[in-house]
């Protein structure tokens, strides 16, 4: 078991065991063999199971008594211990104890085993005694079987998904724990010691006075001093004293942090929280308590605990996908292997056949035989394929039969010969006839009707039915059974058994009929029925076959069957879990539940009862009650609190984790099923389309034959219906759009034409902009009036006044209705008034109100009409629904709910059918068995007569009570009652009582005996698994999926998904954060600021908060005075420290900047509150009644919230939390409407019921006597707190309130209570609260999805880091700082510091944000570009980017119409910002990419004597300095230096339109000659590089005039002043302490750095051919091309979506190396941005521009001679890096190449260089053919320092 696999520890060389036995030792070898021998493992497992059985058989008696069996079983303990000891010893010998890898105690299971064995020995010695009963630890051994379980694949999915979910679950656990701590501390401050006062008798001060059956906390004796809503003792009989231990024996309290946390946890699980709320109300008054409890339930239960569900379902679907993909891959691999083998085999056979056929000796007959065999094989293969298709569903009826043609069928039958031939032929015909009959429609419907009638017969059975009905049903059962049996046999005969059993429906029929036969025999022999025959009702599901829901239902069934293994494995896991906890519970609590009122029904005394108790806790119902009993049994609140851990773990792991996996499976399957259905529907649509097209072709060909026309109409229908749908959608859209609607062109009510002035007036009024607003106001006022009514005193003055208001409101609504009818017409034409649902509702409400007023006025026969009037007036509550239509977003949520209901319909039908089946089984099992006598000693109605004495606990004399024989409130006497009972059970409320009653049920008309038939619990367990665990979850899942689909459907038109939308949402709302910093660094303010923002200070404050939290947790009830004072002064100290922090922050930031940060405001409020609180504690005790300052204590707990902003994961969780709250307002509004409507109905119908004691459920805490009370009661029901009891308390026949002005003998309440509560629970539990779950699952899906996908939760980090670079929140930073920032941000948001520069450049080229004049990027633009690039939002090939931009702008305008006006140009910069003479990030980084690529070639890394261009080693400076430094401005278009009258062709002044780097803006010119933006950028980037080794000399070449050309100059360009003329000469004269930048203008670089060429360049430098320093240059004139004057520059084509690389040969351009983050130091030399020469220009010598041919020739000769002279001396220097095989040949080729280069003429421009070519060098390892044919080939391998060859693996 615990041993590792054999290969883990290779024998021989391994470590010794126990320092003695080596790997080769025979003892160790044998022990190793034994522990790895499978029979040994099974033996150990069997021992474990036997041990579990022994533990389960024990019965625990009170007082440590033992039964005879238990004593015998105890003796087995030694044997078990012995076996486990032997196992442990063998393993220790074989594996070693602990010191080395894979040794015994390095395995978690082995540690557990060892622990159990050691503790087992301890228990064998009696002197340890029963105090430390360590046998409990033996239950841990039950975990061992889990090891084998992990081998089952489907269980692995469940287990793995739970284990994988543990990481996010722990995050959520932290959040929940944090919430619990905060609420517990608040509870500790407010409620500590509050629940210890109760009423004591005046006669006996030690005797408690109860209210009803339980004690109640009290507030005071003096009725004048009492707080509103609190409880006051009756001062004639009792007094309020503070000496009670508290409710639930003192366990439920806030007396110290432990009790408080347990109480808060209990509230979060929504069990028993109302009791705590009511107790605190009694003790302290009801004014403010709800403010504590309602948020606790909403945040704790609805939100935090639902997160668990979201995480689990996400993980489950991920894990299942993973497993499915793996299986799919394995199948594919096997299939491929099989196919290759098969194909080769078939080829071999076919070739053999060909040979045989070709042979001369093969006879014709043999050939025919071979051909026939081939034909048969082909046919068989075809049939197999078709069968495979139809079989996949496995739910079709006898579809497959058609495949078996008559011939095949006949051939399979053996035909007997002889005299019987005629008989067999007749039999065959008869069989065919029957077969056709069975398949007809009428036979199908006949069977369905029979099933329906049978179901009706089953359903009419009820308790106390007349004997004739019993007899009729008895015989009907036989008749139906006979009919169904004959149907089964007829089908079997007609189809043959094989085909019959291929249909799953038929298999099901057969099982049900067999079950019914068994049941009939059983009831004859033994009596009693199981109700199995009702399973026939499931056959009604066949009706679905004729409905449109069939495919979706079938797919759901398929999907569920597919995940059956997961479900079964989950159930197995659940069973193991229950088993372990039941055994553990028996060890801990067995025989201990001996309470004053006797042993409770839930206990751990025997194994079956323990299992049921654990199952009950697992369902979450009344788990707190069991926990109270457990704690009390172990010594009460003082000693037994540690035992609460058992129950908490059980609830957390069982209820919240395992049971939520059911929902996870359901969500997953439904999504799966819906995909299947959608795919099928698409297929059907496609087929229809194809048919339609074929038909059209036929019709064209045949000129519309009659038949074809009919078919055509039929086929066209679907597309028409589609058109209709689209029209409807369009109509709806039109309605939503603003602006006046045109008048309908029909006459209204046959009288008013469209031109009629009355109608036009009505139309004008209805369409007034404020008309709807006015109606909304009236609706709101009317709703307030409804809520303000007094339901008890109907004729009170308040009600009379409100009645007059009601007349006014009804008048307004009537006028509105009449105006709309005049405008729209009544009903006859499209668009008329009653054609819309909302208008019908309006009309009904108005008419009913008018009718009820009519009755009121007439006053005739008031008595009989009262209920009618009341029901008519109740309809007024529908008025608030009128607002739904008027608020578009609310209507969207409402539509979503309605749609999810529509989706649920088909499941709802199945659900009701299953509910019905269980109800019928319940009626069969428990019919008439739920009666009891109020005197428990009597067991029949005959005995239950007269009176009996009832003894109360504290009373001296018994009470006399009447004996009454009555049924339980929930029973199974008829199907309707059974369905109600099961509905209550399924909501999980009060089901343990129903379970106890069922197990105690004996026989019909007899009383209960406790645990009479424990096996009846199986019915409930099965029901729970089918319903709450499963069906309800499918329901919830459907609503969740529909809700999510609705949200996604809205976005489909815009072609962006949900995640993209939430990211864009964030971008639109995001603003840069301001981070203040004092300007003067020498001030005191700056020093304070430095302290306040430093990390140590932050940590110090964190530590303070943590210690402060611990201090708050140290408080407890009844603490000593000294202790209390210490706490008070320490608290003051903390308050002082926090005050100092706040003061320091105000000094450091200044008042104005301090208040800009919301956290600072929060701190200030907290500090001020704490100071007031401290002062009040010290000085304010004199006059306690003046003002209630209790709320000030909240500020102590508020500091904890500051902890939340520290952790990254917690920050993200919280951020998402807030986001989900933002998504909820309309959902909450809808829920509020539901509550409002139900509360008003409740007030009207149940408001006058008399308030009773606690047992009655309608009490002073819990009633409908005011609107607020009604809403609280409904909120309680929504959390599921004992709603069935409230429903029973509202039924007809309840006593009326004393103030209700009812006639004597008149009763209140109504039978409507059933419908009212059931519908409310249905809407609330299934619909509304699931919207919460849907929203949460939507928002928190990032917890389980791939973390590399960018989500909105990452973007907060961008805002935070941006603030570090842009502390003043200007919204702009320099592009170099932007690069740094993105490198500092981790992926998926930024690039990360490990991202290769080249990949970063490519991303930036695609992002391409525009730059302003100071080369800064904008905040919103950068964030949006980042999101767009990361999530590929409309990113396309470069040439399509313009179109994509336009589409994206349109999408943004559609989805965010309001924000788009302001933000659109920031989000998607318009083309003119990227085109017209403006720089963009894409252009700059395209230049850097070229440099980077050049650097990675062999010539970028030359270590020769040539001037080496190295990486600029400049560190980043703040943007303010870099932009305002004296010499700043490398790429600043504005800093061009003028020389004389000439101006530089800088970006500012050039009119050439620039191309946008990543996307082209073509304007009709096919060839546009040059691109200033990009080329200027490249040239300037190049010039930024520092010349290091060889500073150039100031003298120029004597032969050439002084008029150098910049990188951008060419004969066709405007004249350029010297870039370094004036400025550099000045810098040289002033002897600056830093080296100046030399030019690296491309034109002055060689074509190919061959050794000779390098030498030539050096010589040229010496002679002064290069750029001169400090010398004024003379301008030379030359002809300018007309096209240039026109301002048409060559455009640079786009970068593609995957940026291609520049096809400038790396050997052609000597680029300098550049810094990864191209930031410049502030002592850089300014220059203007010039443009790059045409790519042809790059290939020529700069001097060629003004050489004569003779001069050129002379120079060439001179250089050639010099080369030859010096080659011998210089060659070894280059041979270090380049090897030439043939020196002579190399020299010859060099000469030839130089000749060709020099002679080449540049007569015309060629087509522009494409960006694919231009950036070719950005691609790694891709080398293009060199234009210089000199035999130099760059090395394909890159220098390891600069290698980006694996760049795609980064980022």
Curated annotation (Swiss-Prot):
Segments in the Extracellular topological domain: 58-75, 129-133, 192-288, 461-475, 523-531, 590-642, 787-802, 854-866, 925-1013, 1123-1127, 1175-1184, 1243-1308
Biased composition (Low complexity): 1604-1619
Binding site for Ca(2+): 1366, 1368, 1370, 1372, 1377
Ranges occupied by IV repeats: 1086-1347
Region (Disordered) location: 381-417, 710-741, 1513-1572, 1588-1653, 1685-1764, 1823-1851
InterPro entries the record matches: EF_hand_dom (IPR002048), GPHH_dom (IPR031649), Ion_trans_dom (IPR005821), VDCC_a1su_IQ (IPR014873), VDCC_alpha-1_subunit (IPR050599), VDCCAlpha1 (IPR002077), Volt_channel_dom_sf (IPR027359)
Expression by tissue: Expressed widely in the embryonic nervous system.
Record's subcellular location: Membrane
Impact after mutating residue 1196 to Q: Partially rescues the cac-F and cac-J lethal phenotypes. Does not rescue the loss of synaptic transmission cac-F and cac-J variants. No effect on photoreceptor morphology
GO molecular function: calcium ion binding; high voltage-gated calcium channel activity; low voltage-gated calcium channel activity; voltage-gated calcium channel activity
Biased composition (Basic residues): 1589-1600
Matches recorded under Pfam families: Ca_chan_IQ, GPHH, Ion_trans
Function noted in UniProt: Voltage-sensitive calcium channels (VSCC) mediate the entry of calcium ions into excitable cells and are also involved in a variety of calcium-dependent processes, including muscle contraction, neurotransmitter release, gene expression, cell motility, cell division and cell death. Probably encodes a dihydropyridine-insensitive current. Vital for survival to adulthood.
Identification of the protein by name: Voltage-dependent calcium channel type A subunit alpha-1
Organism name: Drosophila melanogaster (Fruit fly)
């Amino acid at each position: 078991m615990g041993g590792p696999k054999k290969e883990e520890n290779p024998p021989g060389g391994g470590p010794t065991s126990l320092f003695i036995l080596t790997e080769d030792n025979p003892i160790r070898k044998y022990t190793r063999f034994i522990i790895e021998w499978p029979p040994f493992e099974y033996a150990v497992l069997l021992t474990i199971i036997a041990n579990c059985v022994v533990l389960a058989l024990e019965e625990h008696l009170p007082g440590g008594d033992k039964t005879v069996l238990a004593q015998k079983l105890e003796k087995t303990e030694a044997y078990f211990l012995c076996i486990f000891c032997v196992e442990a010893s063998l393993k220790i010998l074989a594996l070693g104890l602990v010191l080395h890898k894979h040794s015994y105690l390095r395995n978690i299971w082995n540690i557990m085993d060892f622990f159990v064995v050691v503790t087992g020995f301890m228990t064998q010695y009696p002197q340890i005694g029963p105090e430390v009963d360590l046998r409990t630890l033996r239950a841990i051994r039950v975990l061992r079987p889990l090891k084998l379980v992990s081998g089952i694949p489907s269980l692995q999915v469940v287990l793995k998904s739970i284990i994988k979910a543990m990481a996010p679950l722990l995050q959520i656990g932290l959040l929940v724990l944090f919430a619990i701590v905060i609420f517990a501390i608040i509870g500790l401050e407010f409620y500590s010691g509050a629940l210890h006062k109760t009423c004591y008798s005046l006669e006996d001060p030690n005797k408690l006075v109860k209210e009803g059956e339980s004690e109640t906390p009290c507030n005071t004796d003096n009725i004048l001093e009492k707080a509103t809503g609190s409880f006051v003792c009756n001062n004639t009989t009792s007094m309020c004293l503070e000496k009670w231990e508290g409710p639930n024996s003192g366990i439920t309290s806030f007396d110290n942090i432990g009790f408080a946390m347990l109480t808060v946890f209990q509230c979060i699980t929504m069990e028993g929280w109302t009791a705590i709320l009511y107790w605190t109300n009694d003790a302290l008054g009801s004014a403010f308590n709800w403010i504590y409890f309602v948020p606790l339930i909403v945040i704790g239960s609805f939100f935090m605990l639902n997160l668990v569900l979201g995480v689990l379902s996400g993980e489950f679907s991920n894990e299942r996908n993973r497993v499915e993909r793996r299986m799919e891959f394995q199948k594919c691999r096997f299939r491929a292997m099989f196919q290759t083998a098969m194909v080769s085999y078939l080829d071999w056979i076919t070739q053999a056949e060909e040979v045989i056929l070709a042979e001369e000796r093969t006879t014709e007959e043999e050939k025919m035989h071979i051909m026939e065999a081939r034909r048969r094989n082909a046919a068989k293969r075809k049939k197999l394929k078709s069968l495979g298709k139809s079989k996949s569903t496995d739910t079709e009826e006898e579809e497959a039969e058609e495949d078996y043609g008559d011939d095949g069928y006949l051939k399979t039958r053996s035909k007997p010969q002889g005299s019987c031939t005629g008989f067999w032929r007749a039999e065959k015909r008869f069989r065919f006839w029957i077969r056709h009959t069975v398949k007809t429609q009428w036979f199908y419907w006949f069977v369905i009707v029979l099933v329906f009638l049978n179901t009706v017969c089953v359903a009419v059975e009820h308790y106390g039915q007349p004997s004739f009905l019993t007899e009729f049903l008895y015989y009907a059962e036989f008749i139906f059974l006979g009919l169904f049996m004959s149907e089964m046999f007829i089908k079997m005969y007609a189809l043959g058994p094989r085909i019959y059993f291929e249909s799953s429906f038929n298999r099901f029929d057969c099982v049900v009929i067999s079950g019914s036969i068994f049941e009939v025999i059983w009831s004859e022999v033994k009596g009693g029925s199981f109700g199995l025959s009702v399973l026939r009702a499931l056959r009604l599901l066949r009706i679905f076959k004729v409905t449109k829901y069939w495919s979706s239902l079938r797919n759901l069934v398929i999907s569920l069957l597919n995940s059956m293994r997961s479900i079964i494995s989950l159930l197995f896991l659940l069973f193991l879990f229950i088993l372990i906890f039941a055994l553990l519970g028996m060890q801990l609590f067995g025989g201990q539940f001996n309470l004053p009122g006797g042993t409770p029904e839930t206990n751990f005394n025997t194994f079956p009862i323990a299992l049921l108790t654990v199952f009950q806790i697992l369902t979450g119902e009344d788990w707190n009650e069991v926990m109270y009993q457990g704690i009390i049994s172990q010594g009460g609140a003082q000693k037994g609190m540690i035992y609460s851990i058992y129950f908490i773990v059980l609830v957390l792991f069982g209820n919240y984790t395992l049971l939520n996996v059911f929902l996870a499976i359901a969500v997953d399957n439904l999504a799966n099923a819906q995909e299947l259905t959608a795919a099928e529907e698409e297929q059907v649509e496609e087929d229809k389309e194809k048919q339609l097209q074929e038909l059209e072709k036929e019709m064209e060909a045949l000129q519309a034959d009659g038949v074809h026309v009919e078919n055509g109409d039929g086929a066209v229908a679907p597309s028409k219906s589609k058109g209709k749908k689209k029209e409807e959608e369009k109509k709806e859209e039109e309605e939503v759009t603003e602006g006046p609607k045109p008048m309908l062109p029909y006459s209204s009510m046959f009288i008013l034409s469209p031109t009629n002035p009355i109608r036009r007036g009505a139309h004008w009024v209805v369409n007034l902009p404020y008309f709807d607003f006015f109606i909304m106001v009236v609706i709101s006022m009317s709703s307030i009036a409804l809520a303000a009514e007094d339901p008890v005193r109907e004729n009170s003055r308040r009600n009379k006044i409100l009645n007059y208001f009601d007349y006014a409101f009804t008048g307004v609504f009537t006028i509105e209705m009449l105006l709309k009818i005049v405008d729209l017409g009544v009903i006859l034409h499209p668009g008329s008034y009653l054609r819309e649902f909302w208008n019908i509702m309006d009309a009904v409400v108005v008419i009913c109100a008018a009718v009820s007023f009519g009755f009121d006025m007439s006053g005739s026969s008031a008595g009989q009409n009262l209920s009618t009037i009341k029901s008519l007036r109740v309809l007024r509550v529908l008025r608030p629904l009128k607002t739904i239509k008027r608020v578009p977003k609310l209507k969207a949520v409402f539509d979503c709910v309605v749609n999810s209901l529509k989706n649920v319909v088909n499941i709802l039908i199945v659900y009701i059918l299953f509910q019905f089946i269980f109800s019928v089984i319940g009626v069969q099992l428990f019919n008439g068995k739920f009666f009891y006598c109020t005197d428990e000693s009597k067991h029949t109605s005959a005995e239950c007569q007269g009176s009996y004495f009832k003894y109360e606990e504290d009373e001296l004399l018994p009470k006399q009570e009447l004996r009454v024989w009555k049924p339980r409130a929930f029973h199974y006497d008829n199907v309707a009652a059974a369905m109600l009972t099961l509905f209550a059970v399924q909501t999980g409320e009060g089901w343990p009582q129903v379970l106890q009653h069922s197990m105690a049920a004996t026989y019909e008309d007899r009383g209960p005996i406790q645990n009479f038939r424990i096996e009846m619990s199986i019915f409930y367990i099965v029901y729970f698994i089918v319903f709450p665990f499963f069906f309800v979850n499918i329901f919830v899942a459907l609503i969740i999926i529909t809700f999510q689909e609705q949200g996604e459907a809205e976005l489909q038109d815009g072609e962006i998904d949900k995640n993209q939308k939430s990211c864009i949402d964030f971008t639109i709302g995001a603003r840069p954060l301001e981070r203040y910093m004092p300007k003067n660094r020498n001030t005191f303010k700056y020093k304070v600021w430095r302290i306040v923002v430093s990390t140590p200070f932050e940590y110090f404050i964190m530590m303070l908060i943590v210690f402060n939290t611990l201090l708050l947790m140290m408080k407890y009830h009844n603490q000593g005075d000294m202790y209390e004072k210490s706490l008070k002064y320490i608290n003051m100290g903390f308050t002082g420290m926090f005050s100092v922090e706040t003061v320091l922050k105000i000094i450091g930031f200044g008042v104005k900047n301090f208040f800009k940060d919301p956290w600072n405001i929060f701190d200030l409020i907290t500090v001020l509150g704490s100071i007031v609180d401290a002062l009040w504690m010290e000085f304010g005790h004199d006059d306690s009644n003046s003002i209630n300052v209790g709320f000030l204590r909240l500020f102590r707990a508020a500091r904890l919230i500051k902890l939340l902003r520290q952790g990254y994961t917690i920050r993200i969780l919280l951020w998402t939390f807030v986001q989900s709250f933002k998504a909820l307002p309309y959902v909450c509004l809808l829920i509020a409407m539901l509550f409002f409507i139900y509360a008003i109905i409740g007030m009207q119908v149940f408001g006058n019921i008399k308030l009773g004691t606690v047992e009655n459920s309608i009490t002073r805490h819990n009633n409908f006597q005011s609107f607020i009370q009604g809403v609280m009661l409904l909120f309680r029901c929504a959390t599921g707190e004992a709603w069935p009891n409230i429903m029973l308390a509202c039924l007809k026949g309840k006593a009326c309130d004393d103030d209700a002005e009812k006639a004597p003998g008149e009763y209140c309440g109504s039978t409507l209570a059933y419908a009212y509560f059931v519908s409310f629970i249905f809407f609330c539990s299934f619909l509304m609260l699931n919207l919460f779950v849907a929203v949460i699952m939507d928002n928190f899906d990032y917890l389980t999805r791939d973390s590399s996908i960018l989500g909105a939760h990452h973007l907060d980090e961008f805002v935070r880091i941006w603030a570090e670079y842009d502390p003043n929140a200007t919204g702009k930073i320099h592009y170099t700082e932007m690069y740094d920032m993105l490198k500092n941000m981790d992926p998926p948001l930024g690039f990360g510091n490990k991202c290769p520069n080249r990949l970063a450049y490519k991303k930036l080229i695609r992002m391409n944000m525009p730059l302003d004049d100071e080369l800064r990027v904008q905040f919103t633009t950068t964030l949006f570009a980042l999101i767009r690039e990361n999530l590929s939002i409309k990113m396309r090939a470069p040439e399509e980017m313009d179109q994509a931009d336009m589409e994206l702008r349109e999408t943004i305008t559609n989805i965010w119409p309001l924000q788009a006006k302001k933000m659109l140009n920031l989000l998607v910069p318009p083309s003119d910002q990227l085109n017209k003479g403006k720089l963009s990030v894409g252009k700059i980084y395209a230049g850097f990419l070229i440099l980077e690529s050049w650097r990675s070639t062999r010539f970028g890394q030359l270590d020769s004597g040539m001037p080496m261009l190295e990486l600029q080693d400049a560190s980043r400076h703040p943007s303010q300095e870099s932009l305002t430094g004296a010499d700043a401005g490398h790429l600043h278009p504005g800093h061009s230096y003028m020389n004389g009258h000439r101006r530089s062709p800088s970006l500012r002044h050039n009119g050439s339109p620039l191309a946008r780097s990543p996307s082209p803006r073509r304007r009709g010119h096919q060839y546009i000659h040059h691109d200033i933006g990009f080329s200027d950028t490249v040239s300037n980037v190049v010039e930024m590089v520092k010349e290091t080794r060889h500073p150039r000399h100031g003298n120029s070449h004597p032969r050439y005039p002084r008029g150098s050309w910049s990188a951008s100059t060419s004969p066709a360009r405007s004249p350029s002043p010297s870039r370094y003329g004036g400025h550099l000469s000045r810098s040289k004269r002033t002897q600056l302490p830093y080296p100046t930048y030399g030019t690296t203008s491309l034109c002055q670089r060689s074509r190919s750095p061959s050794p000779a060429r390098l030498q030539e360049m050096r010589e040229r430098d010496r002679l002064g051919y290069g750029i001169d320093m400090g010398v004024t240059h003379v301008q030379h004139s030359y002809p300018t091309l007309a096209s240039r004057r026109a301002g048409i520059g060559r455009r640079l084509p786009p970068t593609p979506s995957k940026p291609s690389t520049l096809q400038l040969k790396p050997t052609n351009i000597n680029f300098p190396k550049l810094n990864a983050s191209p930031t410049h130091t502030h002592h850089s030399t300014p220059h203007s941005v010039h443009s790059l020469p045409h790519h042809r220009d790059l290939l020529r010598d700069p001097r060629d521009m003004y050489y004569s041919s003779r001069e050129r020739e002379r120079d060439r000769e001179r250089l050639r001679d010099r080369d030859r002279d010096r080659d011998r001396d210089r060659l070894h220097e280059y041979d270090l890096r380049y090897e030439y095989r043939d020196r002579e040949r190399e020299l010859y080729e060099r000469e030839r190449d130089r000749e060709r280069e020099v002679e080449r003429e540049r007569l015309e421009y060629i087509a522009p260089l494409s960006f694919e070519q231009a950036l070719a060098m950005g691609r790694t390892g891709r080398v293009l053919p060199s234009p210089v044919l000199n035999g130099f080939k760059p090395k394909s391998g890159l220098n390891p320092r600069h290698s980006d060859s694996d760049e795609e693996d980064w980022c």
